Structures are given as structure tokens and as C-alpha cells.
Amino acid sequence: MTKAVLTSISQLALKALLYEVSLSPKPGLVDRFDNGAHDDMSFMTFIDSMIALSPFFQAYIETGFAYAKEEPLLLFNRLRQLGQKAEETMFCATQGINTHKGLNFSMALLLGATGAYLARTPHLMTDLGRFSKEDTLAICRLVKPMTAHLIQTDLGHLNTKKEFTYGEQLFVTYGIKGPRGEASEGFTTLTDHALPYFRQMISQNDPETSQLRLLVYLMSIVEDGNLIHRGGIEAWKGVKADMRLLLQQDLSTTDLRLALSSYNQCLINQHLSPGGAADLLALTFYFAFLEKLL
């Protein structure tokens, strides 16, 4: 019974990734229609990556459930070790292409936290109905003590390094903390912005329109390291401003699709991809499935 419940929830994480890549059109991002601003990956690359990561999603939630009483830092270390194995498996499946590195990190923590939360709330295990928004908030808050040390330990001593990873370079150059920062704050972009917005949208619109509007909203607010890495601070600010204007127009679904298709070409021409917004889109979908919003 327990394993079946944990398996079903881990499959929601996979489903969230499938929904994210399938949502179309997504400016600058890989979707069903084209590869966006990416010349090294396609829709099929994402499928390969998701299949490789799927067994680890189950391992994350089972680890959180099994070690729910452990000190948060010890649980984090277990999840990170699993996450590193998952990352290696992903790169093997994609021939070295980074499809889901940051998202895998976030999913490891949130699935681990989901498992730990379920261990502490057994009624959700016996009657797996809709998670409340309070359940979602509690899960995200469990991540905070697991990752309170992360910025200092991972990014606090970079002055001694000569070569940086992509995330480290963003921190050194711009102070962008990326997924580490989001996790260490308890995923407040999710709990305070993305999910409240999506709950409102889904109560007023059909699912696809709500998802497209959520993407635009995220692109208008997210500190997007991918955009900044590719185009610098001004390019990122420009995309945010463009998306704020698009939101204000309150377009019909048909017109919104046309606007996003047009903006896709604009971002392709500038080689810009809002990968940070895409990751948070997938994480929002995960909790939307738990809450049965979708």
C-alpha cells in the first residue's frame, strides 16, 4: 500500500515534466512545435531525459518517507547523492545535453520533502485525496531546513576556484542563486506567486489557457538564470517587461497563442531561453496535480 502510494505520487512528478515540455507554444523553449532557442536538443531529447530520471523520482520520495525522522541535513545529503546519480544517468541518456539538471535538483528536494510529509501525515496515505494548499506549503517549508546551509557551503568559497560551473558563474557574475536559492528559501516563488496565480487562473479558464497564462506570468517575475546567462541582465529585464505587457492585454486563448508564437521567433533570433521559468512551470504542475487542480 505504502509503496503504491509513493509510486503514484512520483509519477505525478514525471507527469509534470511531460506537461511542461508538451505545453505549446513556449517562447524560446523546446515544445511540440519546435526546439525554441536550442540547437542541441529536441522534444525527443526531453523524453529520453524524463525516462532516465523517472526511477529516481520514486527513489527521492521513498527516501524522504523512510528517513522522515532524520536530521534535515542528513536527509538532504541522501537526496543529493541520489540526485547526482540521476544527473549522471540523464547525461548518459541525452549524450551530455543538459535538459533537466536544475529541475532534477529541485524535484529531488520536493519529492523527498513530500515523502517526509506523508510519513508525518498518515491520513494522506490511507485516503490519498486532494492535497490542500496548506499541505503544499508545509512540504515546501520542509525543504528550508534541509538547504539552509546550501548557499554558504556551495557558493560561499568560490573565490578560491579557477573554473566554475554554469550556476557558480551566474552567482559570481550576477549574484544569481538559482535553484539553490529557491530551495533555501522554501520555494517561495512557488508558494507565494506561481501557485496562487494558477489556482486563480484554473478557476476561471480551461486548463490549457491557464497553463499558458502561468508561463507568461512566470516569465514576467522569475529571476531567470538561463536568460541572464544567454543575454545578460538587460535581456532578462526586457523579457520580463514584454511578458508584463502581454499579461495586461488579457488576450483570448487564440490571440495568446499567436502572440506567444510570434515572441518565440523573437527569442530564437536573440538565442534566449527562459529555462528558469520552465522549471518553475513544471514544479507548479506537480503541486497542481497533488491539489487536483489539473
Curated annotation (Swiss-Prot):
Pfam family, one: CitG
Domain of life: Bacteria
Keyword presence, Cell cycle: no
Molecular function per GO: ATP binding; triphosphoribosyl-dephospho-CoA synthase activity
Coiled coil: none
Broad EC category: transferase
Gene3D superfamilies, A to Z: Triphosphoribosyl-dephospho-CoA protein (1.10.4200.10)
E.C. designation(s): 2.4.2.52
Gene Ontology biological process terms in this record: prosthetic group biosynthetic process
Annotated catalysed reactions: 3'-dephospho-CoA + ATP = 2'-(5''-triphospho-alpha-D-ribosyl)-3'-dephospho-CoA + adenine
Key words of the record: ATP-binding, Nucleotide-binding, Transferase
NCBIfam families: citrate_citG (TIGR03125)
Family note: Belongs to the CitG/MdcB family.
Listed PANTHER family: 2-(5''-TRIPHOSPHORIBOSYL)-3'-DEPHOSPHOCOENZYME-A SYNTHASE, TRIPHOSPHORIBOSYL-DEPHOSPHO-COA SYNTHASE
Name of this protein: Probable 2-(5''-triphosphoribosyl)-3'-dephosphocoenzyme-A synthase
Organism taxonomic ancestry: Bacteria, Bacillati, Bacillota, Bacilli, Lactobacillales
